[in-house]
Amino acid sequence: MAFLYENMDFMRENGYTAELPAYIPENLNPNFELRPYQKMAFENFITHYESPRRPKPTQVLFHMATGSGKTLIMAGLMLYLYKQGYRNFLFFVNLSNIVEKTKENFLNAASSKYLYADEIVLDGERIHINQVDNFQYAERDAINICFATTQG
């Protein structure tokens, strides 16, 4: 069985990779310029997601160093997946302090580490981020995030 990165290398060499949609960087915080490897992570995910041969359910792992921008990539992928029809996202981590920092980054527009642009606009519609305790209270036209931790 081939590793995904081997398939991605083959696809890239043969011109099959997806481009980063403009709406992703346009809706992320302009203070966080995407680095080349982050753009590649987006392109790899989108290429894999759009492949008719991808396994379902789809599970991916971003193996990246601390401080490399994984959470920013997750914010951008939520935008991409929203456009694909997804509305509900579970952010699950092992430590309470990490989940609190993550909430701040996703929800507090006044934070210097806020991940999104001042306004999130997809296809001319303003989208907001909605924190939920469970998806029973999810909003139909929002990015609904349930933050959870194994620590309770």
Region annotations inferred by a language model:
Residues 1-152:
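RecA-like P-loop NTPase motor core of helicase/translocase proteins
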